């Protein structure tokens, strides 16, 4: 409420002492008044303190072993990938702390962004999310297939940065230390090495556009999203300290690796190694293979850390269902416990759920939908059946051959 401009009473700001005639606006509270100038000053102070808190947080980044322990609580398997990510993330934030305090003649540490290669449902997105959460930094996810280079219909690359700014509650300083995960990066690969001379709206052009923000630039972002327009107000964000993690399935890249290794074996004749499965080939990927798949050399050069994830097997999926702190089985047990009902999944049921996920080629991503299909009728009926004290999910229930077993008090 604005101050009363009576001829008899002149209101003054309780903080700076200026009268209502000396400022644009005075806001009244319970026997307290504050002017617009003091409000603006308060905002600046809060902004500076938040920025200092961000910098302070960076000095307390968990060591690689500590990061690995955090990942192990939530992510099953993928040991090599978790180690690579733990080291890369630690070095990234250590680099930021070093840069903030460095002298001009100190070594210039370059940013090491990350490329994750692995099949659908192997945990790429979840790994990135877990890292960001453990570090308490803003996190944003983007889909590379929705992006186009400037001037074409689609989503501008800069809109990725807007998502990060929004995740940081529009605190730009905090966003500038965040993590961005770009999924489906393999879908914007050039189709073959002999690229058409026609305009490539969603392939190489997007790689070039992403390259600019990944390597570090001051980008102008429309605060409301959408396309840029002349005279539009922009938010400036420096991307040099944003960690970019890009991921994709890269279906077929193992064939490129096989071909390269096969040529070397023929060429040298000796010391040949037999690699028996595609998972082993994935661990042999080098920049040359990724370039042959269709990513441009400049883009690959900005992604020096490559983490290959393996296809999850039945045992991995069962462990994912039961072991992590936020395991799906634990979540559904908690849901039914609120109704006073115990929930048990038999071993055969867990194997059947994992088997279905493998059949559908959805990996860990498809586990929840399979449980939802199995549990739908139970979650609908049981809350109204006060006599039910326990529900047992069997293999037959998962396969749709029978209903779950109910135990009555």
UniProtKB/Swiss-Prot annotation:
Tell me any Pfam family this protein matches: zf-C4_ClpX
Q: Which GO annotations describe the biological process of this protein?
A: cell division; proteolysis involved in protein catabolic process
Name any GO cellular component annotation: HslUV protease complex
Database matches in SUPFAM superfamilies: Glucocorticoid receptor-like (DNA-binding domain), P-loop containing nucleoside triphosphate hydrolases
| ClpX-type ZB domain residues | 1-54
Q: Where does ATP bind?
A: 119-126
Iron as a keyword of this entry, yes or no, is: no
The residues that the entry says bind Zn(2+) are 13, 16, 35, 38
* GO MF annotation terms: ATP binding; ATP hydrolysis activity; ATP-dependent protein folding chaperone; protein dimerization activity; unfolded protein binding; zinc ion binding
Q: Which family does it belong to?
A: Belongs to the ClpX chaperone family.
The record's subunit annotation is:
Component of the ClpX-ClpP complex. Forms a hexameric ring that, in the presence of ATP, binds to fourteen ClpP subunits assembled into a disk-like structure with a central cavity, resembling the structure of eukaryotic proteasomes.
What does the function comment of this entry state?
ATP-dependent specificity component of the Clp protease. It directs the protease to specific substrates. Can perform chaperone functions in the absence of ClpP.
- UniProt xrefs under NCBIfam families: clpX, PRK05342.1
- Protein name in the entry: ATP-dependent Clp protease ATP-binding subunit ClpX
Per the UniProt entry, what species is this protein from, by scientific name? Answer: Streptococcus equi subsp. equi (strain 4047)
The major lineage groups are: Bacteria, Bacillati, Bacillota, Bacilli, Lactobacillales
- Gene symbol here is clpX
